[in-house]
Every structure is written in structure tokens, then in C-alpha cells.
Amino acid sequence: APMDFVAIDFETATSVYSSVCSMGICVVENDEIVTVKEFLIKPTPFVFNSYNIKIHGITPEMVENEPTFDQLWDTIKPYVQNKLIVAHNASFDTGALCATLHTYGIEFPTLKYICTVKLSQDAYPDFPSHKLNNLCASLGITFSHHHAAEDAYACACVLLRIMHDYNLSSLDELCEKFNLEVGKIYPNCRVPCLKKKKKKAKKDTAAKKDKPKCNISYKLKKAVKSKKKTPKKSDTI
């Protein structure tokens, strides 16, 4: 059966995960791209870092009259709720989604997600780089980098290409081929998308067979905590 999924991409106003200023969505149904959308978003707090502006070109003036993420959530939620979400470096994009929802006190949606960085590294190990722009150049996919809708479109194209090149037709086949553990978001936690560890000797696995697969202790606070970074000068001005 052909795969249905939604590729997403966030751009942020600062290095803080919850400072989303743009979201791109690319909907794929029956292996066909059917919708590409971009939402401009007014971040909370309304602060921009010049470094981020240089990357994506979104200025405070461009979003000052746009809705905040909580105002857009009723529109965005149907695109992600109970869907398979795909992102290039999914830990960032799902982290941005959860951090932003947490900022507004909104319950997380329920969804599964996979990462095209992890997949492309295994699918195309000889490529010089697996950054989205370089990966797409190697695959002949044309897009405009660091525009959220374009990045979501490119990410969708990458997954469709991997499925085609390896003759795969389902999420189960994809995960089996590339030894991937699907990431999950629940109303109170986020479980990472990981490469499965190779099985150890049987005596080791027998002792652990009763251990639950989803570690629910990966709670909200942990899910939205971004890596501690030294604040950049431009962030603190």
C-alpha cells in the first residue's frame, strides 16, 4: 500500500526551540504530494536573533501582524494528529513543536515520526553530505533552502525517493530495512526516533524481555528541554 505522511519544517526566531516563526507542511497521500503550505507565525516572546534572520530571511516586520502559534493550532493540528510525521533532523522539528505547545500550555498531539537525516545516511552512505541542501543536490531535487514550505517539500521528496530506490511500500518495510525505531509523541511525552541497537546474545535479551518498550518516564519537562547552549551575544542584546 502507498504511504501517507506529512513532512514538516520549522524556522525559529532565535536559538530557543519555542521561538517558531514559520512552519512548512507537505502532505503526501498515496505517494503523491497533494498539499504544500507555509504558516508565518508571530513568536512569543517577540524577539529575533540576527543570525537566524540571516538563515531564513524572516524579519520581525514580516510576522508582527501574523497569528501566534496557539491561534494557529486549530488549523495545524489536523495535519499532524494521528499522522506519520517526517522531518529532516526530526529531533529539532518535533522538539520545536513540543516546546512551542508547552509554552502555550497546549496538550501535545498523538503522532508517529521519522527522520530523513537518519534514513538518508543509511540509504546513501556514499553521499558527501546529508544536510538537506547537499542531499537534494545529490538526488537532483530542486528547492529553495531555509524556506519552511520548500524544506518540507524537499524532505517529502527525499523520503519518496528512498522508498522508490529501495522498492519499499510501507512504514514497516522502511523501518525493517533501515533498522529504525519510530519516534512518537503522546499528550504528555516525546519518544525519540532512534536507530535500533543490534540484538545482543540471547541470555541478555531474555532478562530484558519484560521491560516496556515506551519509557513513559520520558516526561514533558525532558521532552521540551533544549540542549543548554552558551547564549550568543546577539541573543542577549
Residue ranges of predicted features:
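Histidine/lysine/aspartate-rich catalytic loop segments that bind and position anionic ligands
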Residues: 110-120
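Ser/Thr-centric signal marking residues that sit
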Residues: 10-12, 116, 155
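Acidic two-metal-ion nuclease catalytic site recognized across multiple nuclease folds
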Residues: 160-237
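Conserved non-catalytic scaffold segment of RNase H-like nuclease domains
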Residues: 1-111, 125-126, 132-146, 186-194
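Buried hydrophobic packing segments
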Residues: 97, 119, 155-159
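Acidic, divalent-metal-coordinating active-site segment for phosphoryl/phosphodiester hydrolysis
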Residues: 147-161
